[in-house]
Amino acid sequence: MTFGYKLDEDGVTFNLWAPYQRKVKLKILNRGIYEMERDDKGYFTITLDNVRVGDRYKYILDDNSEVPDPASRYQPEGVHGYSEIISPDFEWDDENSVKVKREDLVIYELHIGTFTSEGTFEGVIKKLNYLKELGVTAIEIMPIAQFPGKKDWGYDGVYLYAVQNSYGGPSGFRKLVNEAHKLGLAVILDVVYNHVGPEGNYMVKLGPYFSEKYKTPWGLTFNFDDAGSDEVRKFILENVEYWINEFHVDGFRLDAVHAIIDNSPKHILEDIADVVHKYDKIVIAESDLNDPRVVNPKEKCGYNIDAQWVDDFHHAIHAFLTGERQGYYSDFGSIGDIVKSYKDVFIYDGKYSNFRRKTHGKSVGDLDGCKFVVYIQNHDQVGNRGGGERLIKLVDKESYKIAAALYILSPYIPMIFMGEEYGEENPFYYFSDFSDPKLIQGVREGRRRENGQETDPQSDCTFNDSKLSWKINDDILSFYKSLIKIRKEYGLACNRKLSVENGNYWLTVKGNGCLAVYVFSKSVIEMKYSGTLVLSSNSSFPSQITESKYELDKGFALYKL
């Protein structure tokens, strides 16, 4: 590793890239201060043989300020405190990784701090058997890079190599991955390479880590294409390898790649994909551009990412079922939108968007369905609502089941948001734990203005209210388990060669020898096939269908043809 420190038989070698500094000293707490040697690229290096695991350190800069290591492996006292030397040793018995094929992926997105009452890696470990029984094949963990305080979504992280101290630190995360692997569950880590958080970022004093040309609304964005960008790219790519080698993660979710601007001949996303694929892992991107370039192979000038999120799919179902038309939902709302998303993935694939006031997106062509991840809830779509309401609070139970079937039985990769599978009713708010009064006030006002959030993001109550209650609705949980089982048994993944028909309030999807029937309001449907009932959301559906007309109540049914 180029950045941070390295332990070997000669001692500990520290390496800091800080070209803005003329001199840097290493301060080992309670041991001493040592002058570091600078090379012509701005790297400061020193090897010490009197340093051991558990020692804490900072760097002293030209102005005598002390800063933590930007590649710190652990920040036991938070983003402003000393960095700590940790041992990479761990007794792994997980056989290194779980290799899950895209067509077998059923993802479960969770936030460590609110998934259990403990809010720790250990708390998640206690629920792994439950997740295995649910039928998911991978857990996707929201960012765990060290952020300010003890409560945050994770997207305000500032130490990309340091595991959040309040969650259980690096040893706790290693244990979680190890235990997940023993049950055959893959671990996908959500990482943020489009920006760093607004508090605790000392890299600005060290070198050109951040772009002077591009901005994000969340914090400074990394410099991937200007002077000094070679070292910044290395900093990011080594971070990818770090999570794979040191923590055995099986894949990554890249946050908001539309906010990663890189005009280099080779885009950083392609570089990231190359590193991930070198280790036979997977990488998934969040993008709101509706651009197949993200997942297209290199021979089609793509970045070769394995899959990308599809917000259009969510918006179509949400707007149709709830009737909401505010904000971006104004572009959606008809049953035809659901049909188009089933057929073409993106609804806006070169169409004019009234919300954006421009043409948006591009056709995905014949890319297979497992290049795309769909959902009816996620941390953004729930947490960026003013009241943090989950879908279960916005629609009736039958509509909720219809929504679940629409995405779990789709040809795309389904992603469940924690608690959704049993009808969790607690809200999921945005919360933070900053210490800067001006920043705190800015966040409060911004969330109120942009999202209508009246709850205080800094309040412990907001955080605690967002924790799962684990009050399980057995009927909904059983339905989710059945959907996941059917998806696997009937091989419904990836194949986009479907026959989709619809009326004003109903939709049928035929493929893989099955017919899925979705009835949004009592309707008469003329069936063109004969089949046997496999699963239904209620008892109103006939056990057998033939080529005739049926008056069906609201709900969902799947028939084997």
Curated annotation (Swiss-Prot):
A GO cellular component annotation in the UniProt record: cytoplasm
Positions of substrate binding: 253-258, 311-315, 379-384
Gene name in the database record: treZ
Keywords, in A-Z order: Carbohydrate metabolism, Cytoplasm, Glycosidase, Hydrolase
Example GO molecular function: 4-alpha-D-(1->4)-alpha-D-glucanotrehalose trehalohydrolase activity
Name under which the protein is recorded: Malto-oligosyltrehalose trehalohydrolase
First-tier enzyme category under EC: hydrolase
Consequence of substituting R356K: 2-fold reduction in specific activity
One biological process term in Gene Ontology: trehalose biosynthetic process
NCBIfam families referenced in this protein's UniProt entry, alphabetically: trehalose_TreZ
